[in-house]
Amino acid sequence: MFKRIAIAQIRTYTNGVVFKTASKPKRRWIPWTIFGGSFLGGWYLTQHMTFTDLLAYWRYDALPKNADEVVKYHADLNRRLNGLPIVKQLENAGFVQVIANEEENLLVSRALNTPGGVAIPPRVYYNPSRRETVGLYHLGMKLTGYPFLIHGGILATVIEDLMKEAIRLEKGTKNINQETKNLSISYKFPTLANQFVVVRTTDLQQYGNKTKLKAELMDQSGNRTLVKANATFSSEQGNPKEEK
């Protein structure tokens, strides 16, 4: 009798519920991740990409520079550049536009000079009283490392390019050979592709044939610093006969 009662009690406590395998919780974060990624991608495309920009990324680089599509794309970028508030701010602050020495950095003026890269020449402004130089560069989608973000090496190249231009303007000659002794880069925020960036050099100091200076790369509004840098260059006068 007691045996039957004990067996009944055991069956009561072992009715199968205890041994039931718990179902795996649904991964609700996956749909939200997909939604969030799609939303951010869509926002970026609407804010920073036009149909012309997409064409420049996919097919304009295969066309000659005098093709109608490429010429119109360059004209559109220059119109966008002229409409930036930073342009008027620089002019009001006493900066004057100067002609950049395109032969100084062939990587920027030649290799990267393509639709989707640095499609138009950078616009350079100089203020002799403040000894500051500002460059406006358009960085396209072909210069990305991670999706929609400009590669850090490209940013360093652009900063170094303007630093050399600043030294050339300070010395008053483009016939000068410059060597980068050291370049220190500090990345503060990611830089979105397909927008203009503002590069400004400051604190230029000369010690014989060496020049030290600082620079910062900002977004196209000029309000957010994305990269900071400082560098030392050595300079030697070139052949006077090559001076133009």
From Swiss-Prot:
Keyword Acetylation listed: no
Record's keyword terms, sorted: Membrane, Mitochondrion, Transmembrane, Transmembrane helix
Cell location: Mitochondrion membrane
Cellular component, GO annotation: mitochondrial membrane; mitochondrion
Topology in membrane: Multi-pass membrane protein
Spans traversing the lipid bilayer: 29-49, 139-159
Gene3D superfamilies assigned: Hotdog Thioesterase
Family classification: Belongs to the FMP10 family.
Note, other: Present with 1920 molecules/cell in log phase SD medium.
Name of the protein in question: Uncharacterized mitochondrial membrane protein FMP10
Organism: Saccharomyces cerevisiae (strain ATCC 204508 / S288c) (Baker's yeast)
Gene label: FMP10
